[in-house]
């Protein structure tokens, strides 16, 4: 009940006792109404003099960017800019998805004019743009101890970016590379490490590259060529459609898809390539290609804000604007599930000269472990497995390299086995 309601109830009791005392002509009953009348009068005077506390809120964070699952230290400073506050209670309003790991989010104190109080706590945040909206402030009146509550807005935002797993080696061979030196084999002769071919000696060739064994056989000067290594254009494509990212309870395939996108982007940027990010879901979120740490920060910020969506216009991959991607470049796509229409679109991309790596997070083992054994479960598992084999076979026929990632294991070790030079030779 609000303070005015309480005072009204007390006045009603006092008036009722007074009327009853007059009717029964009993002074004791009439006198019993006096304490209630005095309390109600004092409360009314106290309410008329009560003012909202004049306080300011300052919040300090140990970092404005963290990796999901890490902790962040928060310090809240409350300063009294008005008259003395005898009793003041402050409680931080913490959203449900943030986990408090240590410290206190509330405090109680008496504040003189110009004084301040401080409390600190530590929280853990999942991936995304997170905000602390403000604090709930409670004061009590001096005489009646009636509480007055108000919310003081003071929003502080921070970003929890996805985990980027370190990857050792990925061998890509796009049809087109840039002119600058890098680590991607360009399928062109020149200066490099790996042997590429030979040609007849011409004026200006480096004599240290003359193949003397060939000269001994042919009596003609033959020069060795080595394969050039350059940087490449790489686009990380994150499929954020609802139907492509199934969930199992609180576990979401999309969480692992975002981590895979961050890991792949980090690797290719570290190798000096030009990397862009395209998120296909609620809308087309395009991060223009770039280089270096600043580009990695932009990509992580976009991935931190990424969410799944179910929009009819983006139901399949036909709406993908391929003109955004550099011609005949490398595409790294991450999707939890594909259908026949998606495979058809990927075939068109391959026909246009794009090299495609498809990473598919797989939570099937986790899901099967949560379902009790039955004939229905075994039949459903068989159907899902057969359908997946059909999709994977169709992708292999059009030349898409598929990495089927069981999320219970490490992505880095799987990529090192399937996409590295050594792994491909052994395969």
State each model region's role.
Residues 297-304, 359-361, 368-394:
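Acidic, Ser/Thr-rich peripheral helices and adjacent loops at domain boundaries
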Residues 281-284, 361-366, 408:
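Short beta-alpha junction loops
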Residues 37-294, 330-334, 340, 348, ...:
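An amphipathic, basic-hydrophobic helix/alpha-beta surface used to engage anionic
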Residues 1-58:
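Extracellular/lumenal glycan-associated context and N-glycosylation machinery
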Residues 264-273, 360-370:
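A short, conserved beta-to-alpha structural element at the edge of catalytic cores
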Residues 292-328:
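Von Willebrand factor
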Residues 314-360:
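Exposed acidic/Ser/Thr-rich ligand/metal-binding surfaces
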Residues 383-426:
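C-terminal helix of von Willebrand factor
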